[in-house]
Amino acid sequence: MRQHHHPMALFFTLMLGLGVAQQGIAHSGPPVPDPMNIEGISNAFGWDFEGTEIVTEKVTDSLYVLFGVGGNIAVSVGEDGVLIVDDQFPQMMDRINAAIGELGGGAVDFAINTHWHFDHADGNLALGPAGTWLVSQANSREKMLTDQVINLVGVAYAQEAYPHEALPVITFEDAMQFHINGEQVDLMHFGEAHTTGDTAVIFRGSNAVHLGDVYNNAGYPFIDAGNGGTLDGVIKFCKQTLAQIDETTIVIPGHGPISDYQGLSDYIAMLTDIRDQMMEMIEAGASLEDVLSSDITAAYDETRGDPGLLLNRGYFSLTHKVVDR
């Protein structure tokens, strides 16, 4: 399958680089950098809302993935309407709608948020008022009700409470189904992982799954430990998703190029290996600084990039020493 450079790879490269510079601060001083607003975070990471075009990749005749600024968007288009998974930013919505129109779709009928983070759900601010039915796992909607801080270690983002019209109007606890465009779409929640409100969206007819940021294919994953995410949970969530699919399933990550069953399997093996080595160090009394200076990710750094953010947030999730919740 064709793969292309994903603009969010730059985001993770910059974020991880900033994170390494701040590791000591995160451990021994103020745990959260001064939170930025959307203008600050977009400037810090070089996001170009005006200049970034939407790139479309076909999965099946009725399922596509849109790449732009923010999380990958899955688009189901057919006789029943348009269902999307994640919606990026309102600044991108005209181009997102145009891309959907080129696929033969009209207005977005349903938008599923894989979780509540701004780069996957801020598009709600445009879609909700336009009449789109917004959907999420119940914990994600709960997070959207109030102001949140997302600690990315080197930087932090101040995510404001969503207005009423941008909140999910349909929520679920563990599972729900759509029957749309000739296929069954399963929404499944397997507990805390990247956040406490993650959703795997499985398109049964297309044999594809969108995992949101539980599966990051642009670098190491970010564990939002400050808001209840855990490294153990990411591994569990991915394993339970793997049990729902087969070896020919297309796997859509939250960021990075489209992947497959083997890619997700390798991701699970990598995180399990890192987690096990980290736990061995923790049980021997290792500090965060010990973990950060170790070589437990050396086998993966060449392809995944800087591990600092994963190690920091993973350490705190495994030791339950999260200092910024």
Residue ranges and their predicted role:
Residues 1-11:
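Bacterial N-terminal signal peptides that target proteins for export
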Residues 23-80:
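Zn-dependent metallo-beta-lactamase
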Residues 55-99, 201-203, 208-213:
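Conserved beta-strand hairpin/beta-sheet module of binuclear metal-dependent hydrolase folds
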